[in-house]
UniProtKB/Swiss-Prot annotation:
GO terms for cellular component: box C/D methylation guide snoRNP complex; nucleolus; small-subunit processome. This is Uncharacterized protein YMR265C. One of its GO terms (biological process) is rRNA methylation. GO terms for molecular function: histone H2AQ104 methyltransferase activity; RNA binding; rRNA methyltransferase activity. It comes from the Eukaryota. It comes from Saccharomyces cerevisiae (strain ATCC 204508 / S288c) (Baker's yeast). It holds the Pfam family HAD_SAK_1.
Amino acid sequence: MEEFEEFRRKGEMSSRCGNHRVLRKWNSCACELAVPFEVPEHAITKLHIYDFDNTLFATPGPTEQLYTRELLNLLTSSTLPNGGWWNEPGFLQAAIEISKTKPRRYSWNADIVKLAEESYSAKDTISIVLTGREESKFHKLIEHALQTARSHWKCSENEFRFNAVCLKKRAISEYTSKYKKELMRDFLEYYPSLRELSIYDDRIHQIDAFKSFFHSLDLPRLKWSAIPVRPFTKSLPREQELEMVMDMVRKNNSQALSTSQKFDLRRTPRQIGYILCTASHRLLSIEVIKYLKRRKGRRTFRPKLYEHPLYIPCAEPGKDIPALEIAKVWSNNDTRTFDSEKKVQHISQIFYLEQPGKCIVHFQVTDLAVIASAHHNRRKPLEVYFKATPEPNRYTFTLFPEYIVTGHFYKRDRIEDLEVVTERLINCKEDIHWVPLDNTIPIKAFFGRFAKLAAIPCSNA
């Protein structure tokens, strides 16, 4: 509280001194401060605020398909001794290094960059970057990201600039939303001439909080906009991400004060099949919600449609399919590619070594089945299945009677519903009663295999 009062007193002094001192008060990156000395304070009529992570810059988050939901929640938990994924500078640092070798649009949101440049060039506008990342840990890194971008793009002195770059000062609040609202309140008090305030953010709950904040202000003069931005993200290379996660877990275990905070990593059983892309997973999730809304007497709710990814199994988890069938699917039954045992084994090696993504297979989803869970699991009240048909003239293979889209829930490194789902797939003609969809849904899948990383109790605990 004393730190906060001191911060407020500095703000009051800044207000009396003039020269846009509020920018100095909140700015976190000395090299990024650009005070518009040539513009009188009373001439500032607009404040434009840009979030950094996934709004302006493609900050990498954990790749959902790589981890069980339990582990994903652990990795992103701020209660871990090292603060979790979002408090670990290494992931952001890795993304910045990758950005040096990529086109501008790969790592930076071109639409937001354009808006930011227009904001900075407008004489009546103050433009700032505002992020909930902690100032003490990340200010140099975000400064480095901006400077790297300008150097890589060969920007002029006034291109891709902001008046200030503001990170979270823990003296104000440890909560990002509250911190951002305090900053906006201070700017509104400092610049009574403000007539417009626009804030861009990728998180809907933040946008909703800002709208509530603006509604609570008694400022009829102010035209405000809380603008949701589609999350802009890029994953790190898979092997690099996994290596960094393992290192993060080792650090966590070395810093943990209690054994309950320690955990090891282990793989779930390997699964082989046609792995749905994220967009197709989303389409099928929406279809389930629409179906449940139509069901008479059932209140609408949003089921957790398994864990990523949904897939069409070729075999029971933990089991393989014949190498010849792998070669046939991989080559779309081009006999020239598997006319010898050596060629078959070569394709099989590629299949098991490479990440899914090279072999694309399209399906049409025609039917849906929603079944009450066999063991009435609270986390999984329903089992959901989709019947799929491969595209014409495309060789496909499965050990099951039909091509069925499904998924799993995981408990530690075990597939929690393995027996139930496998039994359904084997006896699908008798056990599953299909409901035809109004319209078929085209989906995109990758022929491949995957296993998730899971958290298990630490063996040294």
